[in-house]
């Protein structure tokens, strides 16, 4: 059975036809006065270019995002569908973007060969899911119900904490009030935002006045939510918008220590489309349990 995977920019993966991996863009829009310039996240704008723009942006410049259109999904599926028996689609978490709905519309047109997953995950979690699906397919006969159940179990074992100090994108996107933003900046708080694959929703859950305190709160939260009796951590990752190697290494090592060296922590750059909303100097810590 020839199978391809179709993802979008939030996966931070690059298209690789030899690996049967295809990528659709999500969009970043830079608005300067009345002028707008649109970029394809991960295609013609990378994280370094975006963060440089955000750092040097004059007052009044805004950055926003836009979804993949129904037509784009349809055209991409049409372009590869004859080469495969099945295309597995993993779009951005439906709780974060309505892009998922466009994928589902197209799925109905190719329902025998296009299966869109309700994964409710983002970033490197998508790469982990693809890897695990490949193993599952080697040991199980494909069925929609079977794969959906596998994905449901996968996402219920995933969680993350996002650490934010630059509140401007959150205010611009209507996710944070100006008053709360002022308080956070005045007291130099680290804002903690939780993400659980169980729901796929982002929620403000705490704040801390130091990075170390924020990291401890994050690990305590993830352990409480994800660790069950006789269950261990399986994978962990640090996703960062920062390019200071030493700083990232210190943050990563602190998480390794807080987890008592229970799991290796990989390091990756955050996708540009997510950074548009989290701002500069933001980072995230992701966990998956067994």
Curated annotation (Swiss-Prot):
It holds the Pfam family DegV. Disruption phenotype: Probably essential, it was not disrupted in a global transposon mutagenesis study. Transmembrane segments: none annotated. Residues 3-289 form the DegV domain. Keywords: Lipid-binding. Hexadecanoate binds at residues 65, 97. One of its GO terms (molecular function) is lipid binding. InterPro entries: DegV, DegV_C, DegV_domain_contain. May bind long-chain fatty acids, such as palmitate, and may play a role in lipid transport or fatty acid metabolism. NCBIfam families: DegV (TIGR00762). This is DegV domain-containing protein MG450. It comes from Mycoplasma genitalium (strain ATCC 33530 / DSM 19775 / NCTC 10195 / G37) (Mycoplasmoides genitalium). The lineage of its organism: Bacteria, Bacillati, Mycoplasmatota, Mycoplasmoidales, Mycoplasmoidaceae.
